[in-house]
Curated annotation (Swiss-Prot):
HAMAP family: Transcrip_reg_TACO1, Transcrip_reg_TACO1_YeeN. Keywords: Cytoplasm, DNA-binding, Transcription, Transcription regulation. It comes from Bacillus cereus (strain AH187). It comes from the Bacteria. SUPFAM superfamilies: YebC-like (SSF75625). This is Probable transcriptional regulatory protein BCAH187_A0615. Belongs to the TACO1 family. YeeN subfamily. Pfam families: TACO1_YebC_N (PF20772), Transcrip_reg (PF01709). GO terms for biological process: regulation of DNA-templated transcription. GO terms for molecular function: DNA binding. InterPro entries: Integrase-like_N, TACO1_YebC-like_2nd/3rd_dom, TACO1_YebC_N, Transcrip_reg_TACO1-like, Transcrip_reg_TACO1-like_dom3, Transcrip_reg_TACO1_YeeN, YebC-like. GO terms for cellular component: cytosol.
Length: 239
């Protein structure tokens, strides 16, 4: 799979820790999920996914409760979910998922982040076909064989189970996210190191050092945008 999920999450968490911007992004995502469906995660699968992700980033309960209460209160603030696709230095492929209340602003900001850092926006579908929507669940304290046995006994199908450093990472279809977590929770797993619905590149590429530095700068510029929720790409950053 080419991705060290714990390293990626740790890098993002350490980068975001000083600014708390990750909390703001989660607050927005939780609000949108709660507003679009029921504010109860038991009956709202989209909200449950966001809350499970938030746990792995240690998002404070106050942030979560505030976002849910805002949705319950009938706030008129509306957000559109928009996806942008584009290319970075050396043709690297990038997908940007956003939640925005101003489409024109977001489109201009995303375009500028690409163009100022050696990239360019593409049309819809220009790179998405090279990525697979994937549920990624990480845990510690069990071997891959033990996890496989748990999932087989629960009759849950997954794509792959890999040991990455001290963790076991399960890759599955997006609609199996809850089934995987439920089976593992029933088997005594109380905490997950990774809980993501992501776009996973079918093939990773490596870039020359100068191009990689420029690419990382571009990704940072995209992630710094208030409306950007997720940035997916096909570059092996070597972490």
């Amino acid at each position: 799979m080419g991705r060290k999920w714990n390293n990626i999450k740790d890098k993002k968490a350490s980068k975001d820790a000083n600014t708390s911007r990750i909390y703001a992004k989660f607050g927005r995502e939780i609000y949108v999920a709660a507003k679009q469906g029921e504010p109860d995660p038991e009956s709202n699968q989209a909200l449950r996914v966001v809350l499970e992700r938030a746990k792995t980033y240690n998002v404070p309960r106050t942030i979560i409760d505030r976002a849910v209460e805002k949705a319950k209160g009938g706030s008129e603030e509306n957000y559109d979910e928009l996806r942008y696709e584009g290319f970075g230095p050396n043709g690297a492929m990038v997908i940007v998922d956003t939640l925005t209340n101003n489409v024109n602003r977001t489109a201009a900001d995303v375009r500028a982040a690409f163009s100022k850092n050696g990239g360019n926006m593409g049309v819809n579908g220009s790179v998405a076909y090279m990525f697979d929507a994937t549920a990624v669940i990480g845990l510690e304290g069990k071997t891959s064989d033990e996890v496989l046995e748990i999932l087989m006994e629960a009759d849950v199908d997954v794509r792959d189970i890999l040991e990455e450093e001290d963790a076991v990472i399960v890759y599955a279809e997006p609609d199996q996210f809850h089934a995987v977590q439920s089976a593992l929770k029933d088997a005594g797993v109380e905490e997950f190191t990774v809980a993501e619905l992501t776009m996973l590149a079918q093939n990773d590429v490596t870039l020359p050092e100068d191009a990689q530095a420029q690419f990382e700068k571009m990704v940072d510029a995209l992630e710094d945008l208030e409306d950007v929720q997720q940035v997916y790409h096909n570059v092996d950053l070597g972490e």
